[in-house]
């Protein structure tokens, strides 16, 4: 997760689907993997449940058909494999990310060019307001068109990062550490500094501690 640190060290990388509540629409940030295999005791070890997409939605009395909007941090396959199930959703993606998805470079195998063929895609070009209280922040580097998602909550702003990171990328003192996986290191560095310097609760996209939270805030 961290550039030039802990290379070769095995870590678990949780994959999250975030549900945004409070408005009149059912909104997701990312849709995760469709199929995955994890050790039986992993959730117990870290204090959270590991659920498949439909099962997780059902915990909130939702089905894929109930989803109105999906906001994508980026389009690596582990963030968008369940999109096609959400037949009524508009899918918000950065223009540069969509362009790369359609013509990916061989160096990055995590893009499936046809993965959004059956969904209603809305292109976003840079920072934008998606809904009242929900904005996207253009944060490229980990991917060409990554976007972090800023949400106004009852306890202030929360930001879901648009790039691969965990808590170790955000030390309490000093600059943030660039994501260890990136297509453009300098863009990745600048993006993570921008997010760290914002007055917000930062939710690192692959941090294990988030899985034990029932809601934020």
Put a short name on every predicted segment.
Residues 34-37, 48-51, 55-62, 66-78, 93-138, 144-215, ...:
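Metallo-beta-lactamase
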Residues 90-95, 160-162:
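Short hydrophobic/aromatic-enriched beta-strand-loop microsegments
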């Amino acid at each position: 997760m961290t550039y030039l640190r802990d290379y070769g060290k095995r870590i678990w990388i949780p994959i999250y689907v975030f549900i945004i509540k409070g408005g009149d629409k059912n909104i997701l940030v990312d849709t995760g993997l469709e199929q995955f295999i994890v050790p039986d005791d992993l959730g117990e070890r870290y204090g959270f449940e590991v659920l498949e997409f439909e099962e997780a939605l059902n915990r909130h009395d939702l089905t894929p058909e109930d989803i109105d909007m999906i906001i994508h941090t980026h389009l690596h396959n582990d963030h968008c494999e369940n999109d096609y199930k959400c037949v009524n959703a508009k899918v918000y993606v950065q223009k540069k990310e969509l362009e790369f998805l359609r013509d990916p470079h061989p160096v990055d195998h995590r893009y499936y060019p046809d993965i959004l063929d059956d969904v209603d895609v809305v292109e976003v070009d840079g920072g934008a307001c998606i809904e009242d209280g929900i904005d996207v922040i253009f944060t490229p580097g980990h991917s060409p068109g990554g976007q972090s998602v800023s949400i106004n909550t009852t306890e202030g702003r929360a930001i879901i990062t648009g790039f691969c990171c965990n808590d170790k990328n955000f030390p309490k003192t000093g600059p943030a550490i660039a994501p260890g996986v990136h297509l453009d290191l300098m863009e990745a560095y600048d993006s993570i500094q921008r997010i760290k310097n914002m007055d917000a609760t930062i939710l690192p996209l692959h941090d294990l501690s988030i899985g034990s939270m029932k809601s934020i805030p």
